[in-house]
Amino acid sequence: MPGAAAKGSELSERIEGFVETLKRGGGQRSSEDMARETLGLLRRLITDHHWNNAGDLMDLIRREGRRMTAAQPSETTVGNMVRRVLKIIREEYGRLHGRSDESDQQESLHKLLTSGGLSEDFSFHFAPLKANIIEAINELLVELEGTMENIAAQALEHIHSNEVIMTIGYSRTVEAFLKEAARKRKFHVIVAECAPFCQGHEMAVNLSKEGIETTVMTDAAIFAVMSRVNKVIIGTKTILANGSLRAVAGTHTLALAAKHHSTPLIVCAPMFKLSPQFPSEEDSFHKFVAPEEVLPFTEGDILEKVSVHCPVFDYVPPDLITLFISNIGGNAPSYIYRLMSELYHPDDHVL
């Protein structure tokens, strides 16, 4: 059919364009935009492609998911959305197959040992499966749109009047969180500039426009100022499987200073940033950029004698984190494993 062929070629072009964008680093898109675009493409794949059963569909989603994640391994949000869709397919197939949700969750060590690695049969055909999966993906897209508002709505539970709050760099989620609290509370925000990119300046300008008392400081002053701080509130790029963070460079220094002064460290991050990856997976963890901000090309004599690496992210271990605030509430780092089992199936951790 010519119409189907045209649809297929248009979808292939869109996926190819998305993969190219990922290879170039994702441009200026936020993690939320990446998550939404990934879900949109996967939804189109499900509706436009011909597949007979859940097994065929999962193979298709995995194949395209591997392409997307390989283009930019450090953009973990893309892989997370692929895993969420695979989990949705499993759940909807299970409902039509007459299996309860509870039987899918491996809740205890005994169940893990006795499950024996049996693989489920996804070869049965169910006519309503496609419509059910699309409906579930649409619900997930609606959930994505409300994540920032849901996190910001919890601000008054954590920020009190006349407190001194410290943050680092720029995070849209933290900005919304602080602005929501500022509607009813007066407090002072200290922003570490996050050199060499200095995204903290943008954060400080946005907060001051809302009438929030804001101070920008250099990263070197974090430890000296920490004794005056009541809470540290930060964003993150990824929450890893062990409850640790992959956050902007400089966050580890901030977390260590907070731990030394017994200052609570709160991480504001939506659930789509929760990844089943571990910090030992180097390809997806590390990302380096050009070091011209650290050592400009005008320093020609020095450039010949040194090799400069400019990492984008820091690893922050879970023992430095007090609380995670997500769109579904607040949780300790030790609870991350449970959230992981609710969001992703163990067989989908590696695509």
From Swiss-Prot:
Pfam entry (one): IF-2B
Keyword terms of this UniProt record: Cytoplasm, Initiation factor, Protein biosynthesis
Subcellular location: Cytoplasm, Cytosol
GO CC terms, sorted: cytoplasm; cytosol; eukaryotic translation initiation factor 2B complex
InterPro entries: eIF2B_beta_subunit, IF-2B-related, IF_2B-like_C, NagB/RpiA_transferase-like
Biological processes, Gene Ontology terms: central nervous system development; cytoplasmic translational initiation; myelination; oligodendrocyte development; ovarian follicle development; T cell receptor signaling pathway; translational initiation
Regulation: Activated by the chemical integrated stress response (ISR) inhibitor ISRIB which stimulates guanine nucleotide exchange factor activity for both phosphorylated and unphosphorylated eIF2.
GO function terms (MF aspect): ATP binding; GTP binding; guanyl-nucleotide exchange factor activity; translation initiation factor activity
Family: Belongs to the eIF-2B alpha/beta/delta subunits family.
Subunit: Component of the translation initiation factor 2B (eIF2B) complex which is a heterodecamer of two sets of five different subunits: alpha, beta, gamma, delta and epsilon. Subunits alpha, beta and delta comprise a regulatory subcomplex and subunits epsilon and gamma comprise a catalytic subcomplex. Within the complex, the hexameric regulatory complex resides at the center, with the two heterodimeric catalytic subcomplexes bound on opposite sides.
Function: Acts as a component of the translation initiation factor 2B (eIF2B) complex, which catalyzes the exchange of GDP for GTP on eukaryotic initiation factor 2 (eIF2) gamma subunit. Its guanine nucleotide exchange factor activity is repressed when bound to eIF2 complex phosphorylated on the alpha subunit, thereby limiting the amount of methionyl-initiator methionine tRNA available to the ribosome and consequently global translation is repressed.
Name used for this protein in its record: Translation initiation factor eIF2B subunit beta
Organism listed in the record: Mus musculus
